[in-house]
């Protein structure tokens, strides 16, 4: 029996009954959601694979000695950063252009010609690049917080290479800037790349201050409208989630409302704690392990399981 490729593709297709299957799949691939069908033309969507490459390129620019060329020297660092950043921003510009085109198709903005979209993509790419020095400053404070806050940490290199919380906050700070620039899909893909790598789920909309430290990290969830101050430390399996979801007169969820906790400066939240709703945890407070909290607490509070009373729970907890 010959194993060589067969040239008669029609015969192969018929042997598996593929004609009807391919036709059905081709029709289904246009997308069943009505608001996605504003154009009869196919358009390139953002690529998760490409964005993963972009993120790791950006990380090598932010921490070149650890994630850049292993042969990097003091003399070649400047060139490496410039060259890598140029290549990475070109890739990002294309992904931004694709999201803008998707927004145009789904929202029907009439003025969005290809030339206009390309110009807008370039402007957003430039704005993102301008934010990188501030992102680097914040990340340096995060790394320092991890080193000072974990007695097991032996070096900065160990933290950068081995701490999932640092990987998560690195990608989050990049995702948050994309979110601020009106690129929610790229931001969300970035967050999911981070989630897949670290087990830490931070929505790109969450606003997080400097010197932030997630220790261990597995199972941490931080919701879209969370506001977290400076020098906050949280441990594994902490949830900063929503308590309930308001609906409009048609029964549809009302999106975009503030529904997640506000964590003020210098707060520590220990493993397994669940904080739900638009509550405020006052500055310098400590939330003990496995606490279930649905009410605000003043500055300087120490909340343990023994102090928590039974609170009414509404649907959607922890999301």
Curated annotation (Swiss-Prot):
**Do you know which Pfam families this protein is assigned to?**
Hexapep (PF00132)
- Provide the induction entry: Transcriptionally induced in the absence of sulfur, requires CysR for transcription. Part of the srpG-srpH-srpI operon.
**Localization per record:** Cytoplasm
Q: Name one GO molecular function term.
A: serine O-acetyltransferase activity
- Cellular-component GO terms for this entry: carboxysome; cytoplasm
Which UniProt keywords are given for this protein, alphabetically ordered? Acyltransferase, Amino-acid biosynthesis, Cysteine biosynthesis, Cytoplasm, Plasmid, Repeat, Transferase
Q: Return the protein name.
A: Serine acetyltransferase, plasmid
What species is given as this protein's source?
Synechococcus elongatus (strain ATCC 33912 / PCC 7942 / FACHB-805) (Anacystis nidulans R2)
- Gene it is expressed from: srpH
């Amino acid at each position: 029996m010959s194993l060589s490729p067969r040239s008669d593709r029609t015969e192969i297709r018929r042997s598996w009954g593929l004609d009807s299957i391919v036709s059905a799949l081709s029709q289904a691939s246009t997308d069943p959601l009505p608001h996605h069908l504003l154009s009869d033309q196919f358009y390139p969507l953002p690529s998760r694979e490409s964005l993963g490459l972009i993120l790791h390129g950006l990380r090598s620019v932010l921490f070149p000695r650890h994630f850049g060329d292993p042969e990097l020297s003091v003399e070649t660092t400047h060139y490496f950063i410039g060259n890598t950043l140029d290549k990475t921003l070109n890739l990002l510009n294309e992904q931004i252009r694709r999201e803008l085109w998707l927004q145009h198709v789904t929202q029907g903005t009439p003025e969005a010609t290809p030339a206009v979209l390309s110009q807008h993509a370039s402007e957003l790419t430039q704005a993102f690049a301008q934010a990188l020095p501030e992102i680097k400053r914040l990340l340096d404070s995060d790394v320092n917080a991890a080193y000072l806050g974990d007695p097991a940490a032996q070096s900065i290199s160990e933290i950068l290479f081995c701490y999932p919380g640092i990987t998560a906050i690195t990608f989050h700070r990049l995702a948050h800037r994309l979110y601020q620039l009106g690129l929610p899909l790229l931001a969300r893909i970035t967050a999911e790349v981070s989630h897949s790598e670290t087990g830490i789920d931070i929505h790109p909309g969450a606003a997080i201050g400097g010197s932030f430290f997630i220790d261990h990290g597995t199972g941490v969830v931080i919701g879209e409208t969370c506001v977290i101050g400076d020098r906050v430390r949280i441990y594994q399996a902490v949830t900063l989630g929503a308590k309930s979801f308001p609906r409009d007169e048609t029964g549809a969820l009302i999106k975009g409302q503030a529904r997640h906790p506000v964590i003020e400066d210098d707060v520590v939240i220990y493993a397994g704690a669940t904080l739900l709703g638009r509550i405020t945890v006052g500055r310098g407070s400590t939330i003990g392990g496995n606490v279930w909290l649905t009410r605000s607490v003043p500055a300087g509070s120490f909340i343990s399981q023994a102090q928590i009373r039974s609170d009414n729970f509404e649907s959607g907890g922890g999301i």
